[in-house]
Amino acid sequence: MERGRRMSYISPGEQFNVVDLDEERTRISTLLRNRGYFYFRPDYMTYQADTTLVPGGHISLRLIPVPGLPAAAQRPYYVGDASVYLFGKNGEAPNDSMMYKNLNIHYYKKLQVRPNMLYRWLNYQQFVRNAQMRASNRTRLYSQYRQEQVQEKLSQLGIFSYLDLQYAPKDTTAVCDTLNVTMQATFAKPLDAELELNVVTKSNDQTGPGASFGVTRNNVFGGGESWNVKLKGSYEWQTGGGEKSSLMNSWEMGVSTSLTFPRVVFPHWGKREFDFPATTTFRLYIDQLNRARYYKLLSFGGNATYDFQPTRTSRHSITPFKLTFNVLQHQSEEFREIADANPALYISLKDQFIPAMEYTYTYDNASARGIKNPIWWQSTVTSAGNLTSVIYRAFGQSFSKEDKRLLNVPFAQFVKLNTEFRHLWNMDKNNKIASRVALGALFAYGNATIAPYSEQFYVGGANSIRAFTVRSIGPGGYHPAESRYSYLDQTGTFRFEANVEYRFRIFKSIWGATFLDAGNVWLMRKDEARPNSQLELKTFPKQIALGTGVGIRYDMDILVFRLDFGIPLHLPYDTERSGYYNVTGSFMKNLGIHFAIGYPF
């Protein structure tokens, strides 16, 4: 109780507030329920207030138990036997049963889950690290926190559409201090499907739709495992280009499959997994990118990822193994001409392995208690090729030697940092201000001084600077003489973005928005083929692209349809027009239109 005092809602000198008093009773009640006092409730405490004891308009408060406190609320309870009742996906009542250790399981027709999985979680309170505590009954004290952990963990498995845990006294005697647990659950349908659609258009650039479709098979091996297969595709065509080439000049398609386990598969954590829930995901994928008249890029690979969520607000994702192989195919004469003029572009696209490790930390307090204006922060660090280079070093080769190979193919070596911060200010129920800042840096070294094209940064599009399409600006103040080549080499190794958006309710689920977007990408190293592209402090401010616009959203809570109209205010390159507003051309020519699903940030 004393250790939890720092979380108190009441502090000396603060303004008297009835809401805070109720929150304090709830906090203390939760502390007691986490220590076995199952029947204790906030209403079993009351305040005594006195304004005469403390002068100066202050109130002396004393929190005391209510008179006639029930005897059941004054003693701790222990967890006893457990029973499970599993209903069919259409609500069919159990018609069979089995005993697993001391767990009685009732099910319909066929048991669709492994008994040991249910046993582990319903006996969660027995799994503690301290051997002395395990030897005593203290390990079986009822805990509201552990009840919520068990219920949340089992719900997240995707096995059940309904789940409820009920605790009841073992018998009706006055001295009974044991609670038996009954779990009731209804199986969910084994398959989930997901469809995503996206359309981007701009009157003087690229336009086209994209889509992805995924199917997930839940509870593959009876322990909450899920298997996902996802197909994705998109294509773009040139509008207003004045060329008589094929309308469809770019497309991308791919397929991926992943298998997720609701625990750490390797190494085995044993009892610690109950205090530190985690998942393990194995993923394989293959993507084909076609840039018509230029090249095709085939990428395939796989990774293993551990996800940990030790608290409600923090999440860690560790990828100790991630291997990608890029293959450049079907190079056209036009592309070779561009590559000859820009060797860095060709090097970033050529055949290469990307052996990487990755760590991501995410902080999201939107679901935390008492948070009105939530923040979201995510940072990712990626290291590629370093472990492979260490192995080469062990065999006598220099760590910094270039053109080292893996299976006779060069491999990339770089360090990449990406961080993004978001804040949502809820002014009232009809007005909100959302903001975002994003930074990224990519530094290639050792085996290759040019980072892979697929790892480089770009800006523009429906979720970035909405006055510009994807890869239509940057790096820095560079602007290709041939606009049709722009999306090939308008990437960079340093990224900065800042956005602010005012959202206002128009009518019920219809929201309007006005926004201001800024940002660009730059190169960390000088590139003679792309002048004015290097990151420099003196040119940084004027090379930040700026755009504004308005939008409309249909917010159904679980799904948001969004239509944004963006217009540039400042271009990061020289347009031969003086002043900060250096945009040329008509309003309609520069208007960017984006239709998307979900908020941009």
List each language-model region with its residue ranges.
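C-terminal soluble interaction/assembly domains
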Residues: 129, 137-140, 535, 548, ...
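Membrane-embedded beta-strand positions of outer-membrane beta-barrel proteins
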Residues: 195, 227-231, 282-284, 377-381, ...
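Hydrophobic alpha-helical transmembrane segments and adjacent short intramembrane/lumenal linkers
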Residues: 493, 508-510, 543
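Interaction-mediating elements
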Residues: 1-156, 161-168, 178, 269
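Flexible, small/polar- and glycine-enriched "cap/hinge" segments at structural transition points
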Residues: 519, 524, 549, 553, ...
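Gram-negative/organellar outer-membrane beta-barrel architecture
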Residues: 2-5, 11-14, 21, 41, ...
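C-terminal outer-membrane beta-barrel translocator/porin domains of Gram-negative envelope proteins
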Residues: 98-108, 198-205, 317-504, 514-538
